[in-house]
Amino acid sequence: MTKQNEKIINSSVKMLTISEDESGQRIDNYLLAKLKGVPKSLIYRIVRKGEVRVNKGRIKPEYKLQTGDVVRIPPVRVAEKNDAPISKNLNKVAALENQILFEDDCLIILNKPSGIAVHGGSGLNFGVIEALRALRPEARFLELVHRLDRDTSGILLIAKKRSALRNLHEQLRVKTVQKDYLALVRGQWQSHIKVIQASLLKNELSSGERIVRVSEQGKPSETRFSIEERYINATLVKASPVTGRTHQIRVHTQYAGHPIALDDKYGDKDFDKQMNELGLNRLFLHAFSIRFEHPKNGETLRFNASLDHQMKAILQKLRESK
């Protein structure tokens, strides 16, 4: 009998056979996708207790599934959540539909708005993936190919098949995916700064906030830069990351002495105040272009995502003040 305030996620034992498209992923990630709404802690608990079995045997959470594996999933109940936060975000979910630039049976290409996390978590219960699952309830597989910071807008790839995810991850690994961003930075960017190579080290503050800094102990990182437009006290630059480190463009521009407008971690308060007065209230970093090979047919694809209304308006005001 179900306890009050409990929700049944899986009402009976299920025996599922792993397809070729599902193979290669960890059992814990597979279960998270199958048992939507179940916290990771419960997933690990039912795996550790042996309630989840593969080919009738116990497994560890890091076990990688193979084609033909038979997975036993037990009945699962979780505490009911207050759905109010989701209902508040219904307008955002609906708005995301209009931001889809391309969709086929392999992938979705989205122009992500600023202010939406790619994944719920860290105190957020709403993200791009959750929204797309609400928009595409029939989709069996939806996973991020790469990430964008919450306050960064622009092109985001979402795979609709595991085979597409593997293919695109390989393209990212061998650096054949070309990604370009637009950033509005403080001051006059110096023409000779075309490439920044500075190793980046991730730190976590006592508050739990994640911050990245340039350090010889960090991981190698490289960003290429070119000037798009100059203004009196700012420059619009194109940034093309060669590596994909956390906060890479934001830290590299700060390292060059030209932090990005409205960057709450790495920015400049005086510059931000000037941009606020012009009407900017978001990080001015936008993933505007991507080029890659289609994971199914190998065709070279290129997509562009336009700046939002606020960004366009700020640039126009800066032009008029020159």
Swiss-Prot record:
Biological processes annotated in GO: enzyme-directed rRNA pseudouridine synthesis
Family per similarity comment: Belongs to the pseudouridine synthase RluA family.
Keyword annotations of the record: Isomerase, RNA-binding, rRNA processing
Protein function: Responsible for synthesis of pseudouridine from uracil at positions 955, 2504 and 2580 in 23S ribosomal RNA.
InterPro entries reported in the protein's UniProt record: PsdUridine_synth_cat_dom_sf, PsdUridine_synth_RluA-like_CS, PsdUridine_synth_RluC/D, PsdUridine_synth_RsuA/RluA, RluA_PseudoU_synthase, S4_RNA-bd, S4_RNA-bd_sf
Protein name: Ribosomal large subunit pseudouridine synthase C
Name of the top EC class for this enzyme: isomerase
Catalytic activity from the UniProt record: uridine(955/2504/2580) in 23S rRNA = pseudouridine(955/2504/2580) in 23S rRNA
Active site: residue positions: 149
Gene name tied to this protein: rluC
Lineage of source species: Bacteria, Pseudomonadati, Pseudomonadota, Gammaproteobacteria, Pasteurellales
Top-rank taxon: Bacteria
